Amino acid sequence: MEFHILASGSKGNSTFIYDNGVGILIDCGIARKQLLYKLGNLGFQESNINYVLLTHDHYDHNKNISIFDQRICFCGKGCIKGIDSSHEIKPYKSFQLAHFEIMPLSISHDATSP
């Protein structure tokens, strides 16, 4: 499994996890150009992103969520307007993305759905 922190800080956050041909982008708070540049430096491209998870609705985490098809996006309630309810993440309710088991946790943070 590969785990790459692409950006961290108040100007943008993004992490990329890749394992057995499946890529998950956690947060997309950086510009698309910057995202593609950073992925490219690691030997990946946009097509390697199979799923996008948003941790919460702050701009430094979701700035460029609109570049992704909502069918691959998963987030807490209220983070993406109009997202299918089957893609809403609920704290402590695990779900599968390919061979990954995701267990969302609830934390204290000033956000709609942290």
Residue ranges and their predicted role:
Residues M1-G40, P114:
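Conserved beta-strand hairpin/beta-sheet module of binuclear metal-dependent hydrolase folds
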Residues E2-I5, G29-A31, N50-L54, P104-I107:
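Short, flexible loop segments at the rims of nucleotide/cofactor-binding pockets, characterized by
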Residues K11, D57-N62, I80-G82, D110-T112:
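Active-site environment of divalent metal-dependent phosphoester hydrolases
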Residues I17, D27, H56, I102, ...:
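Divalent metal-coordination and catalytic microenvironments
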Residues K33-G78:
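Active-site metal-binding motif and surrounding structural segment of the metallo-beta-lactamase
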Residues I65-F68, I80-S86, Q96-L97:
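Short loop/helix-cap segments at secondary-structure boundaries that form the rim of catalytic
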Residues H87-P91:
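Short acidic-hydrophobic, aromatic-tinged amphipathic segments that line or gate anion-handling sites
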Residues S94-P114:
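Catalytic core of the metallo-beta-lactamase
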